[in-house]
From Swiss-Prot:
Disulfide bonds: none annotated. This is Large ribosomal subunit protein uL30. SUPFAM superfamilies: Ribosomal protein L30p/L7e. GO terms for biological process: maturation of LSU-rRNA from tricistronic rRNA transcript (SSU-rRNA, 5.8S rRNA, LSU-rRNA); translation. The gene is rpl30.
Amino acid sequence: MALYAIFRVRGRVDVRKDIEDTLKLLRVHRKNYLSIMPKTESIEGMIQKAKDYITWGEIDEKTLAELLKKRGRISRRKKLTLEYIKEKGFNSFEELAKALIEGKVTLKELGIKPFFRLRPPSKGYGKKGIKKHFNEGGALGYRGEKINDLILRAI
């Protein structure tokens, strides 16, 4: 089962109520928040509704492991540690990332927060900024595998 990485690019000002509600369901409450969601039909419908505020794509194991290692949280103030992962039966962040992508476990089952607070990406979003689609040189919309580059720059 593939996982989508959904990254909120635009802020909270002048967003229609129905789109704001959809963004909350996707767990991207603020700018530069990222959430990990399964690739299902209902999630894809929500993504299409909020496509003018987010960018998304399929996350790979290496990027997911790095994201969990550096930005994973158990609670608001507690970082995700290797000791916590070992308590849950995984030997490394890479093993956990592989299990998540294969669909064997979920973040909720492990008690890990399903969203990540990131920094703005180094070198920016794109030449044309945050108001244009990715295909036009901007930041919004579907990126596919290139979402991994954006995530690594924002960690």
